[in-house]
Amino acid sequence: MLLLIIRHADAGDRDPAQWPDDTQRPLSDKGRKTHRRVSRALGRLELVPELVLTSPWIRAAQTADILVEERKLDRPPVPCTALADTPELSRLADDLGKPPSGAVVAMVGHSPWMEELGAILLGGSATSVRIDFPKSGVLGIDLAELAPAAGELRFLLRPKQLS
């Protein structure tokens, strides 16, 4: 399986006056535009997920929606509460199920949890690998199973590389 770990697109600055519940903060116009460009580039690179799991937080869900819309995927994003917290592989594995070995799966979530998930899958712990992961960045990891240190780094794509 190729796992695409995607950090949500830009959602502007945290503003407790406007968004007292930060889980409800939406993407900015800049974030929407950038992620549309990233999603189109993934298609050009033939990195089209069969399944998209997303944090239920609004900005992550909107990022996942853009990916599904731009890639014209058959299935809507699947909300996954495990992506809105410190990564627990057992919870993620339950939500993921058993995809075919050649499947491409995307997980959309938040910093620092997406960086920690990548580090766990590549190096065995959340601090084993430092990953500088920009908004709308895409980390590609080849995996046979969702387990610590089971992954092999395939790429880290930054939005600026995908114009």
Residue ranges of predicted features:
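Short, flexible micro-motifs
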Residues: T34, P112, G140
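Acidic, His/Gly-rich catalytic cores of divalent-metal-dependent hydrolytic chemistry
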Residues: S163
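Domain-level recognition of soluble alpha/beta enzyme cores
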Residues: S125-E152, P159-K160
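Active-site-proximal alpha-helix that buttresses catalytic centers in soluble enzyme cores
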Residues: L2-S90, D94, L122, A126, ...
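Non-DNA-binding regulatory cores of transcription-related proteins
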Residues: P99-A106, S111-G137
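A polyampholytic, Gly/Pro-enriched intrinsically disordered region
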Residues: L96-A106, A149-L157
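Active-site donor-binding loop signature of nucleotide-sugar glycosyltransferases
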Residues: H8, A82, L143, F155-R158
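Charged/polar, solvent-exposed surface patches and flexible loops
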Residues: D29, D94, K98, E116-A119, ...
